[in-house]
Amino acid sequence: MKLSVSEKIRLILNRKNMTVGALAEATGQTRQNLSNKLSRSNFTEKDIEEIAAALGCEVEINFKFPDGTEI
C-alpha cells in the first residue's frame, strides 16, 4: 500500500516529535494553510522541497514505467 504525501509528512513529523504548527512556521506559512494542504494532500513541488528542507530530509521524484524502468 502506497502512502500519500500527507501521510509521509505526518509520519516524519511524528518521528521528529514536531507539530504541524512548528512545520508551518519553519516553512513560512500559517498552520491553517498547511493543515489544509495536508488534509487534501495538495502540494506543489516547491511546497514539498520546502517541507523536506524544514524536516532535514531530501526529496526524490522518479517516474516508473510499466516495465520497471525508472527516470
Predicted stretch roles:
Residues 13, 24, 52:
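The alpha-helix within a helix-turn-helix
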Residues 1-3:
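A detector for short, charged/polar N-terminal pre-domain segments
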Residues 5, 16, 44:
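Flexible coil/turn residues that form the inter-helical turn or adjacent wing/linker of helix-turn-helix
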Residues 10, 35-36, 49:
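Key DNA-contacting residues within the recognition helix of helix-turn-helix
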Residues 40-53:
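Short, basic-rich loop-to-helix N-cap that marks the start of a DNA-contacting helix
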Residues 17-32:
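Short alpha-helical DNA-recognition segment
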Residues 56-71:
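Short C-terminal boundary/hinge segments that cap the last helix of small helical domains
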